[in-house]
A protein has these predicted regions:
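Alpha-helix N-cap and loop-to-helix initiation/capping positions
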Residues: 74-85, 113-124, 152-160
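Short, glycine/acidic-enriched loop or turn micro-motifs at the edges of active sites
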Residues: 36, 146, 169
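N-terminal pre-domain/capping segments
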Residues: 1-99, 127, 134
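Conserved beta-strand edge residues that scaffold enzyme active sites
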Residues: 38-39, 63, 108-109, 147-148
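Single conserved hydrophobic/aromatic residue that forms the stacking wall/gate
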Residues: 162-170
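Short, small-residue-enriched loops and turns at beta-alpha junctions
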Residues: 12-13, 109-111, 147-154
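Active-site groove signature of glycoside hydrolases
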Residues: 94-113, 142-147
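Generic enzyme active-site microenvironment
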Residues: 31, 141-142
Length: 170
């Protein structure tokens, strides 16, 4: 039986974010996801989940400054420490909210950085995130995003995913 989660970043946008939890429950959803929880405390969000009988399904690792067009940090060699701090923050939220998966946005390929450096950074960051999340009982998930919706997005097709070294390879 398929299960659907309401994406509160995309649905019920006529309401304030915290009011969207009730709107999702009223529409019959049992689970929710959204881009980022970090503008609110985990306690505020947990209260909305509990009050509305909802399960937190997924959210993203911090992805840089979304308002300025950033769409992830995983492929940025000059932002590794920020990426790692984001993994720690996401785990702290997930431990309160109860979700068992977190999505990592690869990011827009940085200009002026060679392919090998970008790929090595990306794979090392994925390995770091996968190891930390697994230790916390959380699954790391990824999504490809086409370059029409996000020009320059690094992980933009499955061919790249299959030809890149696995984060689990030694």
């Amino acid at each position: 039986m398929p299960r659907f989660a309401a994406n509160l970043s995309m649905l019920f946008t006529e309401q304030d974010f915290l009011a969207r939890f009730k709107a999702a429950a009223d529409a019959g959803f049992q689970g929710v996801e959204y881009l980022f929880p970090y503008e609110f405390s985990s306690a505020e969000i947990k209260a909305q989940l509990d009050a509305n009988g909802l399960t937190q399904v997924l959210f993203n690792l911090p992805a840089g400054d979304w308002a300025k067009g950033e769409r992830g940090l995983a492929c940025h060699p000059d932002r590794v420490e920020e990426f790692r701090a984001g993994v720690k923050l996401a785990i702290a939220y997930a431990q309160v909210l109860g979700n068992t998966q977190i999505n990592c946005l690869a990011g827009i390929r940085p200009a002026g950085v060679d392919d090998e450096t970008v790929e090595k950074t990306f794979v090392a960051n994925l390995k770091y995130a996968a190891d930390k999340l697994q230790a916390a009982g959380i699954k790391l998930v990824m999504e490809m995003i086409n370059t029409r919706d996000i020009p320059g997005f690094y992980l933009n097709n499955t061919c790249l995913l299959y030809t890149s070294p696995s984060p689990r390879d030694p």
